[in-house]
């Protein structure tokens, strides 16, 4: 008579038939709505667990009105406190601690892909740069999706400026206070060629010859040093020579 919780009923084949809310050892047929059991809630109707209730449900729970993510009639307390996505009404929504967070703007990972969420909902219309938590770093989003493997020079708006920007590992690094150090920081390619990059932006005003070099590992013990010479005219690389200097 001391048991209070959910009890499962099985058919003659041993398969679960349904589940019921038991209070003090007896099925409580008078219970309707959300019932708290330990650290989670269940939704019952005339004492029976509504196991076919799934997805987002609008309800007032513990005095808090909101949209809640329900799994087979059960609302779990998500103590991990991270964002997940849940599909409802043609949209994907950001859920935090089992509740839709309409104030959230940022990224949420789902099935190995990071999505851009705006005001609690994945914005599939978003293509362009968005702020990140890292200083001077902007993530490039295509149709709401962030692709960390994306490289290239793309035309977009960044901080109110429309220009050609370098995207590397899905991000553009651009500082409002960066100073010219005498040569391009790096180079980025698109369908029109290879371009000189200064402070994350294609530098159309750069013309000249620029030399760079880097080491490449060829084994645990050995590496090679490659020297690069770029000829640049109005930001476009017109020729590039690579020379292996030593090994």
Feature-to-residue mapping (PLM):
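Extracellular adhesion/carbohydrate-binding repeat motifs centered on closely spaced tryptophans
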Residues: 1-247
